């Protein structure tokens, strides 16, 4: 990546990945998760603290060309906030609903654990998520293009 240009991956169709979130794995590797127009979230890995990166590939997580965010929690697990919806690859965008939270131990296998918003009115977008000192997750996102919504997530209460 140079001068903020999109990362070009390899595959049957070019992977144009933007807006990365960085995860730090227990073994020291870094992983980025990125939004795409390829109907899935893109990923790339680094074993040298970001000096070099693997080829960008598509994950199994759906993406409708809408923003995502991810965070590595203090216990080493990873959290992803995203719209759990795929568009046809190459289409501009899909409905920005539902807005979901997924968890992963390895950054590869993601399990949806919570739906924050799910309405045909749509437009739950540009999420951001962090883990607070209290261990809870704190998320903000655009709500129906009308306001910013805040949500606190206590993972101990999710089965």
Predicted regions and their residues:
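Asp-box/BNR beta-propeller blade signature and adjacent active/binding-site loops
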Residues: 1-159
């Amino acid at each position: 990546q140079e001068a903020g240009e999109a990362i070009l991956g390899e595959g049957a169709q070019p992977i144009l990945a933007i807006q990365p979130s960085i995860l730090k794995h227990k073994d020291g590797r870094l992983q980025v998760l990125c939004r795409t127009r390829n109907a899935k979230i893109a990923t790339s890995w680094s074993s040298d603290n970001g000096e070099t990166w693997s080829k960008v590939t598509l994950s199994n997580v759906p993406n409708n060309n809408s923003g995502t965010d991810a965070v590595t929690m203090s216990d080493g697990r990873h959290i992803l906030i995203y719209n759990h919806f795929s568009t046809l690859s190459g289409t501009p965008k899909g409905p920005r609903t539902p807005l979901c939270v997924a968890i992963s131990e390895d950054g590869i296998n993601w399990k949806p654990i919570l739906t924050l918003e799910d309405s045909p009115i749509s437009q739950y977008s540009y999420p951001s998520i962090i883990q607070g000192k209290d261990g809870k997750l704190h998320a903000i996102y655009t709500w129906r293009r009308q306001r910013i919504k805040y949500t606190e997530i206590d993972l101990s209460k999710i089965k």
